[in-house]
């Protein structure tokens, strides 16, 4: 019991002192969360939802929900997208909600390379359920929670701020590269004060990602090609850094993948993915097998995503290397 309470309280302080965005293991399934430059990258409108349960060994440690919709306007060389995300830490103690709209402009460099410049604006809100907090002065060594806390409730247990992000994509038939800059204005999510100073705003999140695509079997009418896509994802936000390296493979209606995630302080997890595609629908299930010192207590991370790529008559002239995102 004490171990769980200590975890939740420490987790709350960590969120307040230097919050970080949730990063989906199936990052390809939430492209706008990765980089606003992905708005309108697919040949047709697409949408998706995702659910992530992090550290299943603890009771509702972190749960994240997300949804998006985006489409292209070929005649305008443009794309738009909308992203909604909710993050629930400590079984409802601390909640984060985000809603944003993205616009991306596509600039064709030549017959082989295109650039996409993305801009995203939205709102970022945080809320604290003070009544669910358990403080050390409430715990009796013998009887457990028996006292009222002397901690003072903040005047404001919620805050909403403007959130601005941008991104760049380089697309070709042989590779893709991208950089995303989230929270450029470092939204103020302060609820607590430390030594009479407000807790700093949400740190800028730097995301670098890229990959290539090897076609194993060419597609034909009604059938997508089979391919393997080696890729990487690097994220830095405040003191936190992570690197995912692995590959995604699509073989007919079945797809799978495996990545290794390293957090620079230590090896973190091995990510295993399996899924299938039926018509315009795509469902993926992944599991993060924790290999760090948390493995014995925290358990792994479970994630499920579902996407739909609406029917289309033709593909964009340059986007073949991002099929794993579609």
Regions found by a protein language model. Name each.
Residues 2-10:
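Sec-dependent signal peptide recognition
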Residues 20-326:
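Subset of outer-membrane beta-barrel
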Residues 14-16:
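N-terminal signal peptide c-region/cleavage motif recognized by signal peptidases
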């Amino acid at each position: 019991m004490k171990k769980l309470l200590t975890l939740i309280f420490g987790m709350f302080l960590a969120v307040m002192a230097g919050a970080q965005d949730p990063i989906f293991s199936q990052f390809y399934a939430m492209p706008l969360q990765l980089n606003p430059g992905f708005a309108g990258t697919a040949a047709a409108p697409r949408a998706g939802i995702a659910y992530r349960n992090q550290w299943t060994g603890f009771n509702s440690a972190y749960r994240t929900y997300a949804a998006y919709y985006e489409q292209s306007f070929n005649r305008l060389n443009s794309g738009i997208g909308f992203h909604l995300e909710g993050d629930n830490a400590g079984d409802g103690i601390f909640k984060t909600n985000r809603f944003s709209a993205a616009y991306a402009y596509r600039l064709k460099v030549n017959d082989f390379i295109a650039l996409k410049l993305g801009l995203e604006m939205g709102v970022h809100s945080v809320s604290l359920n003070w009544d669910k907090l358990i403080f050390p002065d409430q715990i009796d060594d013998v009887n457990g929670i028996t006292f009222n806390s002397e901690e003072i409730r903040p005047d404001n247990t919620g805050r909403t701020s403007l959130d601005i992000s941008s991104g760049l994509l380089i697309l070709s038939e042989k590779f893709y590269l991208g950089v995303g800059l989230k929270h450029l204005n470092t939204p103020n999510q302060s609820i607590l004060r430390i030594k009479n100073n407000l807790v700093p705003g949400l740190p800028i999140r730097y995301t670098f990602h890229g990959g290539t695509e090897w076609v194993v079997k060419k597609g034909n009418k009604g059938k997508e090609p089979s391919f393997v896509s080696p890729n990487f994802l690097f994220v830095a936000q405040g003191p936190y850094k992570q690197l995912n390296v692995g590959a995604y493979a699509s073989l007919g209606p079945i797809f799978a993948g495996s990545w290794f995630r390293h957090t620079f302080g230590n090896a973190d997890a091995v990510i295993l993915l399996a899924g299938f595609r039926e018509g315009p629908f795509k469902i993926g299930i992944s599991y993060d097998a924790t290999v760090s010192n948390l493995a014995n207590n925290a358990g792994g991370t479970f994630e499920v995503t579902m996407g739909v790529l609406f029917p289309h008559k033709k593909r964009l002239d340059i986007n073949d290397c991002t099929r794993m995102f579609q």
